[in-house]
Amino acid sequence: ALEYCDYVETDVRITADNNLILFHDPDLNERFIKELTTEEILSQLDNVKKDELILSSRDQIKGKVNFEIKTDSLLQPQIDILFQKMLPILHPEDIVTSFNWKSIQDFKELFSCRYGIILDHEDALFEAKSLSIHDEDMFFMVERTLLDSRHFDLPLNRTVIWTVNEKNDFVHFLDMGAFGVITD
């Protein structure tokens, strides 16, 4: 993948025993990741070693990374632990993003990398526009249909559009001046 892209996007979740793992889905076999210990997760995954599952060092991943921090259904103490554990992992060329705008705002001064918020509905555009004016470093990960909204007015040079799978759209958005696109 690194041959064809500038960044790799991956989801970060926290386990019941407060370990960070790279895992897209919120659950595993109908149990939430946040409720499972690392050992319980390992017992359900074939051929995965503990040191491969737990994200403990930036050295585990090559290239630039967009870490999407998944906080859905977490309590605030777990959210704080998740973000605090991410801080030493982040590399200056990375981007850390989340649907949890509050946590991005709370931790942005501590990040050693770029940071951004994720938008997937039109109502969020107004608040995001306000943030774009007051925070010139913030990036915006925008669901592609929001670009068609008459309310879209975010700085394209700090906008990443998802999910774009057609080559023509990919080229079009980059030609428009978008910072990037996320594709499957």
How should these model regions be labeled?
Residues 1, 11, 41, 67, ...:
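Conserved, mostly hydrophobic/aromatic
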Residues 2, 58-59, 87-90, 104-112, ...:
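Surface-exposed amphipathic alpha-helices with a cationic face
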Residues 4-6, 61-65, 92-94, 111-115, ...:
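Short, well-ordered coil/turn segments that N-cap beta-strands
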Residues 6, 12-64, 69-72, 117-120, ...:
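An active-site metal/cofactor-coordinating segment within enzyme catalytic domains
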Residues 13, 43-51, 116-184:
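C-terminal active-site rim and adjoining tail of enzyme catalytic domains
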Residues 15-18, 22, 75-78, 100-106, ...:
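Active-site-adjacent beta->alpha loops and helix N-cap segments on the catalytic face
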Residues 75-88, 102-119, 125-132:
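Distinct, well-ordered alpha-helical segments
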Residues 98-102, 164-165:
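Short beta->alpha linker loops
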